[in-house]
Amino acid sequence: IVFHESKSLTREVITKNTKPEPNGFYGNSKLQAENGLHKLDDEQFRVVILRPPMIYGPNSKGNFMRLIKLARITPVFPAYHNKRSMLYIDNLCEFIKQIIIREKSGVFYPQNNELADTVEIVKYFAKAYNHKIFMWKWLNIFVHIGSLFLNSINKMFATYYYDPNMSIYPFEYIVCSQEKSFEYVLNNNEDK
């Protein structure tokens, strides 16, 4: 479920009290499906709704891989720091395993222990690929201007994360730290 469509670079923290605001037919249909599934939950049939943030791993599709590619080729990057919730695929798999073992039901918000920062991700992969990149604050004005016209800029630079307390459960599911997961992605990507 998309809680809402980010149209600005304002800081957004999702809490357990945040009401879903689907941004279109797809998001609305997912919310309706969730509401219908909740009605089926009982002792014989457990319903689990997972609302993970961006999931990443080796050879994953989407924005994370685009960010890695950018880190390999761009000579400059805005020093525009943010916070983002992310979830490594192995951590998601462990979370699902623990939910099944414990026969849990409900709505869950798993995420890595660490919040990600777009600038730090780009720095990490640029260094790993031995690529010189300059991070300049004066480029931040272009982030602000671009965010008015391009949703992709908002997706890359907006601060948007789950309250870390939402992701604490009575079982361990973080099998790989964020830094180790980046290392694993680096060493196991087909596009090296």
Pin down the residues of each PLM region.
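A conserved pocket-lining segment of Rossmann-fold NAD(P)-dependent short-chain dehydrogenase/reductase
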Residues: K69-L87, N91, F95-Q98
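Mid/C-terminal beta-alpha module of Rossmann-like enzyme folds, strongest
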Residues: F95-I153, F182-K192
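A hydrophobic C-terminal alpha-helical subdomain
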Residues: N140-E179
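Conserved donor sugar-nucleotide recognition element shared by glycan-biosynthetic enzymes
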Residues: S29-K30, S60-F64, S85, T118
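Residue-level signal for the nucleotide or nucleotide-sugar donor/cofactor binding architecture
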Residues: G24, R84-L87, A116, Y173-C176
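Catalytic helix-loop patch of NAD(P)-dependent Rossmann-fold dehydrogenases
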Residues: S8-I49, M54-I55, V76
